[in-house]
């Protein structure tokens, strides 16, 4: 369900990753198609290339989800990794801009329920769109523009995309407040689609099928 409102409303929670519960396991391979040297992780890794792998060519997520990054220390372009197989770099990079993956961490899914507020301007001002327990492949289709300058993730964990159809750079919103687009590491206030990240603890669907 997606609804629009004209004025901002009081925030629910402060920005916090909280404690990670449950089981996390990912297998990384140096070459494509799950070949070459491999390593298994069950916790965050700020630098894969320091001692584990020279590069990442393919990935198998056995339990998760995970958030991977283009650069060390959880920086750069973000890649959401849900349960499933990723035989090549372009299976996890919707933007197709970079084949680099140098750090990753488990994603905290704190609730089976999802609620997100999108705002046109920074500091939760301007036009507002509310999304509850739904995926939205096009904000335009719901009468909302592509400019999103601040976000409140009230329940659940979400991923937003630059373009419709879940394409382009990915931006993850864990429960909390994002007063300005630079707080989700975007260079401009552009989001055109958003969806829920769903843990198999509550949802058995597994990996989201990208278009």
UniProtKB/Swiss-Prot annotation:
Q: Which residues carry this modification: N-acetylmethionine?
A: 1
Source lineage: Eukaryota, Metazoa, Chordata, Craniata, Vertebrata
User: Which residues are recorded with the post-translational modification N-acetylalanine?
Assistant: 2
Q: Where is the Beta/gamma crystallin 'Greek key' domain?
A: 24-63, 64-108, 114-155, 156-198
Mutation: residue 75 to H; reported impact is: In CTRCT22; uncertain significance
Q: Which GO terms describe its molecular function?
A: structural constituent of eye lens
Please report a single Pfam family linked to this protein: Crystall
Connecting peptide, as annotated region: 109-113
Implicated disorder: Cataract 22, multiple types: An opacification of the crystalline lens of the eye that frequently results in visual impairment or blindness. Opacities vary in morphology, are often confined to a portion of the lens, and may be static or progressive. In general, the more posteriorly located and dense an opacity, the greater the impact on visual function. CTRCT22 includes nuclear cataract among others. Nuclear cataracts affect the central nucleus of the eye, and are often not highly visually significant.
Q: What is known about what this protein does?
A: Crystallins are the dominant structural components of the vertebrate eye lens.
Q: Which GO terms describe its biological process?
A: lens development in camera-type eye; visual perception
Q: Give the PANTHER family listed for this entry.
A: BETA-CRYSTALLIN B3, BETA/GAMMA CRYSTALLIN
Which named protein is this? Beta-crystallin B3
Q: Which family does it belong to?
A: Belongs to the beta/gamma-crystallin family.
Annotated source species: Homo sapiens
According to the UniProt entry, the note on domains is: Has a two-domain beta-structure, folded into four very similar Greek key motifs.
Q: Which UniProt key words apply to this protein?
A: Acetylation, Cataract, Disease variant, Eye lens protein, Repeat
- According to the record, the residues making up region (N-terminal arm) are 2-23
Q: How does this polypeptide assemble, per the annotation?
A: Homo/heterodimer, or complexes of higher-order. The structure of beta-crystallin oligomers seems to be stabilized through interactions between the N-terminal arms.
Per the record, the domain of life is Eukaryota
| Location of region: C-terminal arm | 200-211
């Amino acid at each position: 369900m997606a609804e629009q409102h004209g004025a901002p409303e009081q925030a629910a929670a402060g920005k916090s990753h909280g404690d990670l519960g449950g089981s996390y396991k990912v297998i990384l391979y140096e070459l494509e198609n799950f070949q070459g040297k491999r390593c298994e992780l069950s916790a965050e890794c700020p630098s894969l290339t320091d001692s584990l792998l020279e590069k990442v060519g393919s990935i198998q997520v056995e339990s998760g989800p995970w958030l991977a990054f283009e650069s060390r220390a959880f920086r750069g372009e973000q890649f959401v990794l849900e349960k499933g197989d990723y035989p090549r770099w372009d299976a996890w990079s919707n933007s197709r801009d970079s084949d680099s993956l140098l750090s990753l961490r488990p994603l905290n899914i704190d609730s089976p329920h999802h609620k997100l507020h999108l705002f046109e301007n920074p500091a939760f001002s301007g036009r507002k769109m509310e999304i509850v327990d739904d995926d939205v492949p096009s904000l335009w289709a719901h009468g909302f523009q592509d400019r999103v300058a601040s976000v409140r993730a009230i329940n659940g964990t979400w991923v937003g995309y630059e373009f419709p159809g879940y394409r382009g750079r990915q931006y993850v919103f864990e429960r909390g407040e994002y007063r300005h687009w630079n707080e989700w590491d975007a260079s401009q206030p552009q989001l055109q689609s958003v969806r829920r990240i769903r843990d198999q603890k509550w949802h058995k669907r597994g990996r989201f099928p990208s278009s």
